[in-house]
Amino acid sequence: MRRILVTGAAGFVGGHVLPRLAAAGDRVAGIGRGGAPRLPEGVAYETIDLLDEAALSAFVARFRPTEILHLAGLASVADSASGPGQTWRVNVNGLMNLVAAVEAVPGCTFFFVSSGEVYGSAFLAGHALTEDSEPLPRNTYARSKWVGEQLLRDLLPRIGVKLVVLRPFNHIGPGQDERFVVASFAGQIARIEAGLVPPCLEVGNLSSYRDFLDVADVAQAYAGLIGRAESLPDGRVFNISSGMPRTIASALDGLRDRARVPFEIRIAPERVRPAEIPLAAGDAGRLRAATGWRPLVAWEDSLTRVLDDARARLAASRETGRGADPRS
């Protein structure tokens, strides 16, 4: 039986991957900064900050994982730009603390969730990139992930821990907060429908092409790779992507078609990223060859799920009197 530790278990992706890992019959434990999320039966959870080295080391030594899925970290490009110091502290110092803790469990496999963002300027080639493309990160978040990859390649072999690098591209789904573009559109639409704000949706650059996946497909990719940990080569990198880029405008159009009321669109200068990459897409052929994975959730269903979730969360927040927190 595997003993799988998931960091960042209370976050967006954690809520989708924990049930898949638990369903395989393995022992699963999660850690995160927040309180315990709704957990599948049999999954343990403990509130631990990655920057608390002592607590982290004690938990790893006690649980003794055979696989680690490292989801935890700051994931917003915009937040990283406005607060680079905190990004480096969490994404690199926190990672260093986890590596120190993992010294207690030689022989385990460390699945590091990096990001398709690390390719950066390489996307200017204008086509879907394979894992052989040279990363040329362009922002603080991407640089922190690329440094994390290099750090692990240096440190894990010294302690007998296998490394597998995961580079997911944009993913959407229930539970994502509004720092991310599709969730932001959905949250704004839900508030417009409820009459809480004027019927005007604020957007940034709509012409960029991005490689979107449903979070359920990303979670399945993670679970499939973890289930084959023994056969994966040390240091292997896997893109997790559809290979079918779509414009951000097409996501907005799809949500607009599902909206219950009409609304206008306004370009908000503060939402426009400087020097935006026109097209970012990944080739996941290596992942398909290794596990047979392919995306199963239709794009239209993903958009419906995102908007329904935004409506449900808004309704729940109004019932409890909290108002609508776009970052929840």
Residue ranges of each PLM-predicted region?
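N-terminal Rossmann NAD(P)H-binding glycine-rich loop of SDR-like oxidoreductase domains
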Residues: 4-23
